């Protein structure tokens, strides 16, 4: 199979609509990650992946004995060699499979984009030597795969992400609470959902994770038509989660709809920021490499404070600089 049609003309980013037509979910994830890594060598982010893998930026309070002067000479930035307990991360991906994720106006539903994003993050982290797990939810928890780094883990994870989004309404509380109960070691929790759920209960569940020392990243996946409400003709609109239909003239409600959606998005983002969680709104038309880049930049900013929950610090990975 020749994946070149997924390359945007004149650029190196993958068009999501073309990407979703590529083979399996596992193939799509691998293609995004490998394309991303290759693109780093021809972009302003050249060398970024190496720094992310083996180093972290110096922050006040760090021991200057561990500064790597060779990296400073190449980049003119201060970096420290990562310790062993900083490089081994445990990540759990929480992916929304409720019926609202089945909506899509650009040839692929939100569910396919969300699954590809989750599989991409899993493929990237596994390549770093990190343990990755998965929890899918719709109303309640559907599937749970504990974080592991071993042969076959990525295959099991991507198989659980295949299939349609056909569960009941979005409820963010059960998956967040289950992760808080069963994941004892501090790690990374990534929530991938359209976040079309009440915000009031979200704060309590997220605070359980951040208070326990977990790093939390939230990706709100929305279709461009949901954001802009770009429909033109009056018609019957169906609520995918409740099944209710209502006759709507888009021209009449467009502005109020946009205002309410924006207010909801601000509430979700403010809740995340208040709790120290990273928040990203990702339209399904956005190239997945950019979402991956944002994820890596989050890890660069917060990696200095995230530590696995075990006593002591190891020797620097690869020896003292």
Residue ranges of predicted features:
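Exposed, interaction-prone extracellular/peripheral surfaces
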Residues: 1-38, 44, 57-62, 71, ...
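N-terminal low-complexity, intrinsically disordered segments
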Residues: 65-75
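A positional/architectural concept
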Residues: 45-51
């Amino acid at each position: 199979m020749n994946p070149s049609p997924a390359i945007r003309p004149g650029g190196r980013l993958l068009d999501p609509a073309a990407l979703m037509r590529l083979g399996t979910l596992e193939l799509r994830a691998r293609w995004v990650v490998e394309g991303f890594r290759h693109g780093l060598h021809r972009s302003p982010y050249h060398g970024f992946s190496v720094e992310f893998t083996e180093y972290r930026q110096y922050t006040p309070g760090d021991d200057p004995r561990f500064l790597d002067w060779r990296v400073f000479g190449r980049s003119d930035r201060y970096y420290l060699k990562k310790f062993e307990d900083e490089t081994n991360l445990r990540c759990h991906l929480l992916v929304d499979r409720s019926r609202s994720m089945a909506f899509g106006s650009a040839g692929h539903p939100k569910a396919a984009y969300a699954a590809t994003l989750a599989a991409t993050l899993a493929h990237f982290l596994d390549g770093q030597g990190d343990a990755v797990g998965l929890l899918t939810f719709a109303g309640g928890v559907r599937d749970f795969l504990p974080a592991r780094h071993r042969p076959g883990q990525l295959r099991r994870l991507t198989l659980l992400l295949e299939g349609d989004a056909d569960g009941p309404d979005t409820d963010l509380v059960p998956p967040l609470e289950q992760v808080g109960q069963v994941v004892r070691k501090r790690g990374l929790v990534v929530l991938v959902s359209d976040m079309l759920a009440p915000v009031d209960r979200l704060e309590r569940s997220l605070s359980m994770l951040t208070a326990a020392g977990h790093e939390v990243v939230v990706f709100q996946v929305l279709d461009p038509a949901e954001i802009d409400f770009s429909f033109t003709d009056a018609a019957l609109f169906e609520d995918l989660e409740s099944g209710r239909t209502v006759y709507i003239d888009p021209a009449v409600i467009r502005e109020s709809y946009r205002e309410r959606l924006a207010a909801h998005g601000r509430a979700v983002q403010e809740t995340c920021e208040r709790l120290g969680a990273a928040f990203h709104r990702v339209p399904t038309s956005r190239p997945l490499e950019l979402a991956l880049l944002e994820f890596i930049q989050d890890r660069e900013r917060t990696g200095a404070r995230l530590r696995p929950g075990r006593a002591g610090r190891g020797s620097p990975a690869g020896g003292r600089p």
